[in-house]
């Protein structure tokens, strides 16, 4: 609130805003959900939302365009809203509810935008880590527990770094998640900007930052059941990189 760090995040309508939002909480107390464990702040709505992020790169893309920093929040299916007998075409959840595509002058502005997005929805972030901007910024700000860690496919162990890449097998997983989502749910999707990138995407994803961010949100949501953050929290606290601030 009022540009005060670590306070409540409140949305305001603006013609020059950086976010497209299709879902806001009806009651303010439902937003900014969090709790503390081992003196570390954790998001409190991880069963309802998950975010993905694709930081901007300094090099130009194939079309000679500077990439944007992108972010997306996916609203998971809520069984209390969309009961099992309800036809999928009538669901109100299981769709994207927030997107962001912008290239601020300062990379920390992008990092703070992604953090505030996650704080408002009370969700974790599965970031693109070819560029470790989001990961480092969340850690620096004391929001390490707002990051999602995947599992190593070969060992089955939790990965040492949060998020995922956009190359090799990781690209295939992003495309698989998008293919499934579009096949079953695209008719209900409210964010045309993200569907447009899905329509235009090719093998080179450099010009499609929102596609990557949304893909990471889908992948991250799928990994939540395999995300024992407690071990990572203990490791992080042991090294004592930063002070934590409670509100």
For each feature predicted by the language model, list its residue ranges.
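RNase H-like, metal-dependent nuclease domains and their acidic two-metal-ion catalytic environment used
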Residues: 1-149, 181-247
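Short alpha-helix plus adjacent loop in nuclease-associated cores
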Residues: 147-185
């Amino acid at each position: 609130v009022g540009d005060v760090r670590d306070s409540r995040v409140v949305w305001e309508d603006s013609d020059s805003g950086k976010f497209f939002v299709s879902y806001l909480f009806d009651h303010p107390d439902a937003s900014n959900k969090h709790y503390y464990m081992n003196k570390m702040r954790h998001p409190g709505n991880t069963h309802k939302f998950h975010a993905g992020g694709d930081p901007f790169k300094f090099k130009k893309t194939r079309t000679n365009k500077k990439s944007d920093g992108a972010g997306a929040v996916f609203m998971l299916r809520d069984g209390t809203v969309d009961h099992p007998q309800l036809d999928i075409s009538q669901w109100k959840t299981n769709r994207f509810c927030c997107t962001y595509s912008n290239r601020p002058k300062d990379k920390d502005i992008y990092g703070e935008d992604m953090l505030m997005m996650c704080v408002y929805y009370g969700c974790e972030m599965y970031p693109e880590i070819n560029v470790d901007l989001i990961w480092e910024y969340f850690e620096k700000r004391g929001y390490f527990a707002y990051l999602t860690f995947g599992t190593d496919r070969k060992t089955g162990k939790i990965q040492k770094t949060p998020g995922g890449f956009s190359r090799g097998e990781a690209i295939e997983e992003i495309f698989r998640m998008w293919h499934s989502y579009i096949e079953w749910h695209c008719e209900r999707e409210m964010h045309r900007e993200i569907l447009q990138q899905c329509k235009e995407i090719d093998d080179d994803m450099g010009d499609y930052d929102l596609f990557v961010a949304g893909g990471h949100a889908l992948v991250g949501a799928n990994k939540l059941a395999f995300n024992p953050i407690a071990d990572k929290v203990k490791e992080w606290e042991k090294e004592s990189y930063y002070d934590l601030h409670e509100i």
